[in-house]
């Protein structure tokens, strides 16, 4: 925290935490300028985020595998030890509750991450079902959020930097593929490195005890200096993930969104007998046509900016005085100016959105009655083939 203050971080509240929102290069730099700079440099060389606030929960016991299969939509039975998997947790109503990464050490030992603000809720959710529905399972839960500092380093030069720091680790693609992790000794303490990314670039997450965190953070910057490694905050994190089409729980989701609504069908274990929310996914309303679905939108006039929260409409203009309800198709959930594409990119939840690709629609604006013409596109704006992720 002191390093962030020293390096001109501006903070925002995230759950119970103060997180760096963005870093000012100098006093005259605006938030917009800082975020554009951080985003561009991360994709050009490398950037690093303090992700320590992510919730971390340890699951142990002889029935840990069965418990995990019940808690998440994903299947973990065939998952190999020392691999990771992006996972989705639903409520009993079948709506998305939280997401995170599941690390499988073995069938009796898992570590999961949660959203920063969702950690207490997820742990309580797990405890409730363990105590009231499955008391026969021998499983033990432990919150380890504050036991590990987490760094997320990503960008095409991230491997070059991190290999200088951990010289005893082989970071080649063959030895350290995407969505695997390693544990190692680092200066008489245990560290964990996972190859994962929330930016869409080559990336790694480093977990280490808080006592060694500052020393390691500064060492990473020492080796990253030649690559102009930049620290970035939560706003740049959100912009970079939007370019890649990654969702944020609570932004693309609002308690009424299912995995199918955001094109996450692939995250539902097809052969699983049961998991929390499975029955609700088969309800008539949950499976009906015309539900809001996640899409990307770009303005036809690339100089225009789309505001978050605005409505998606079929009409080009609104009357100066609205006397009857205006039919709308959905809303804008995320919107940023992409410095890497040089125009505004937005994500939206639109009724039947997957069938509207390429269609021209309109987005309302707070600046008048003339709506912004947009095109409905795939929400993945950068690297749709994942070549950067697995490079």
List PLM regions with ranges.
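Conserved, structured C-terminal
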Residues: 1-13, 19-30, 106-108, 113-391
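Well-ordered mid-protein domain cores that form the structural environment of catalytic cofactors
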Residues: 75-129
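Acidic, proline/glycine-enriched N-terminal capping motif
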Residues: 1-90, 95
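Short beta-strand/turn micro-motifs at beta-sheet edges
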Residues: 43, 99-100, 194
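Residue-level detector of beta-strand structural context in well-folded domains
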Residues: 55, 87, 100-101, 182, ...
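Acidic active-site catalytic centers that drive phospho-/nucleotidyl reactions
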Residues: 50, 99, 205
């Amino acid at each position: 925290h002191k390093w962030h203050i020293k390096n001109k971080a501006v903070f925002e509240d995230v759950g119970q935490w103060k997180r760096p929102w963005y870093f000012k290069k100098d006093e005259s730099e605006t938030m917009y300028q800082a975020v554009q700079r951080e985003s561009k440099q991360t994709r050009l060389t490398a950037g690093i985020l303090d992700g320590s606030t992510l919730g971390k929960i340890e699951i142990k016991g002889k029935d840990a595998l069965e418990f995990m299969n019940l808690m998440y939509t994903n299947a973990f039975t065939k998952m190999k030890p020392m691999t990771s998997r992006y996972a989705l947790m639903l409520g009993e109503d079948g709506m998305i509750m939280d997401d995170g990464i599941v690390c499988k050490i073995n069938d009796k030992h898992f570590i999961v991450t949660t959203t920063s603000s969702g950690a207490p809720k997820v742990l309580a959710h797990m405890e409730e079902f363990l105590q009231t529905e499955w008391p026969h399972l021998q499983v033990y839960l432990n919150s380890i959020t504050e036991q590990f500092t987490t760094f997320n380093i990503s960008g095409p030069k991230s491997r070059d930097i991190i290999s200088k720091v951990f010289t005893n680790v082989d970071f080649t693609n063959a030895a350290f593929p995407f969505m695997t992790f390693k544990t190692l000794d680092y200066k008489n303490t245990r560290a964990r490195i996972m190859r994962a990314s929330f930016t869409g670039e080559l990336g790694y997450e480093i977990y280490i005890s808080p006592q060694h965190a500052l020393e390691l953070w500064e060492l990473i910057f020492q080796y990253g200096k030649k690559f102009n490694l930049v620290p970035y905050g939560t706003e740049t994190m959100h912009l970079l993930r939007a370019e890649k089409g990654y969702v944020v729980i609570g932004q693309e989701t609002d308690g009424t969104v299912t995995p199918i609504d955001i094109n996450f069908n692939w995250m539902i274990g097809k052969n699983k007998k049961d998991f929390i929310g499975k029955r609700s996914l088969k309800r008539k309303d949950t499976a009906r046509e015309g539900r809001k679905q996640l899409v990307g939108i770009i303005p036809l006039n690339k100089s225009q900016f789309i505001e978050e929260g605005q409505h998606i409409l079929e009409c080009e203009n609104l009357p100066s005085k609205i006397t009857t309800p205006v039919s709308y198709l959905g809303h804008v959930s995320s919107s940023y100016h992409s410095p890497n594409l040089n125009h505004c990119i937005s994500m939206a939840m639109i009724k039947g959105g997957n069938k509207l690709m390429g269609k021209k629609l309109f987005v309302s604006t707070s600046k008048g009655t003339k709506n912004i013409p947009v095109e409905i596109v795939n929400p993945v704006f950068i690297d749709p083939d994942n070549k950067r992720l697995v490079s």
